[in-house]
A protein has these predicted regions:
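Beta-strand/loop substructures that line and gate deep hydrophobic ligand-binding cavities in soluble
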Residues: 31, 37-38, 137-195
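Amphipathic, low-complexity, repeat-rich surface-exposed segments
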Residues: 2, 13, 168-171
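Short, surface-exposed coil-to-beta transition loops
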Residues: 54-56, 120-121, 142-146
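Flexible, solvent-exposed loop/hinge segments and secondary-structure transition points
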Residues: 100, 117-119
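A short, structured loop/turn motif at beta-sheet edges
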Residues: 62-66, 127-131, 148-157, 197-202
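N-terminal alpha-helical membrane-insertion module
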Residues: 1-7
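Short, hydrophobic/aromatic-rich segments at coil-to-beta transitions
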Residues: 109-113, 128-136
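Hydrophobic ligand-binding cavity/cleft-lining segments
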Residues: 7, 11-14, 19-112, 203-209
């Protein structure tokens, strides 16, 4: 490969990075969220004040929070309920995810301090407010993942916020190409919760009829 070719490749890569950072990154990190949601201080933010990266994604679910919460509460690797996304991708990464289509009664009462493995990370519940907030944090403190359920008129706004501390420059650079992949997985997860919550709400309505 000639010096000219290398220079051209470097220029193309640099131009692509600039394009991504200026035009694509923010929509990827805030998919589904309103400007207000993306900029708001949310429960769980206080667990990691000096985050180097934040992703806020959201979806509206046509079901009350009581039908959404069970799916959030039981999330996690087997024997918990999985993450409702592409299990085969997560399992290639060694996460042992098996997305449940039923409510698992034994995982409906997460407790503050309770932990579970998540690949190389050990996560623990830091904030548990049933039908409203569930926040977890990694053992090293560098990752906080919070779910906020905001019910209005029988529908629920489900907000997922990830906050990261990336101590090393290589970590910060390495995170950039991972961001589109995280959107792919999280979008599937949010739709997975929406589908399950809607079905559960319908089942409960039928049972009451």
């Amino acid at each position: 490969m000639t010096l000219k070719t290398l220079a051209g490749a470097a220029l193309a890569a640099g131009s692509g990075a600039v394009l991504y950072l200026k035009l694509l990154r923010q929509p990827i990190l805030t998919w589904g969220a309103t400007v207000e949601e993306a900029e708001a201080r949310l429960p769980g933010d206080e667990l990691l004040e000096d985050a180097d990266g934040v992703a806020t994604r959201a979806i509206t679910i046509d079901a009350p929070a009581a039908a959404v919460w069970p799916w959030v509460a039981q999330m996690g690797p087997y024997p918990r309920g999985g993450a409702y996304t592409y299990d085969w991708i997560e399992n290639l990464l060694g996460l042992n995810m098996h997305s449940a289509d039923i409510v698992l009664p034994e995982y409906q009462q997460p407790q503050v301090g309770e932990g579970f493995g998540y690949g190389a990370n050990k996560m623990s519940f830091k904030i548990v407010e049933p039908k409203h907030v569930l926040a977890t944090q990694s053992a090293n403190g560098n990752w906080v993942w919070s779910f906020i359920l905001d019910e209005q008129d029988g529908t629920t706004r489900l907000i997922s916020r990830n906050r990261f501390r990336l101590p090393r420059l290589r970590d910060r650079i390495g995170m950039i190409p991972m961001e589109p992949g995280s959107l792919l997985m999280e979008r599937k997860m949010l739709y997975g919760i929406k589908q399950r919550a809607g079905k559960l709400a319908s089942q409960r309505e039928t049972a009451r009829a």
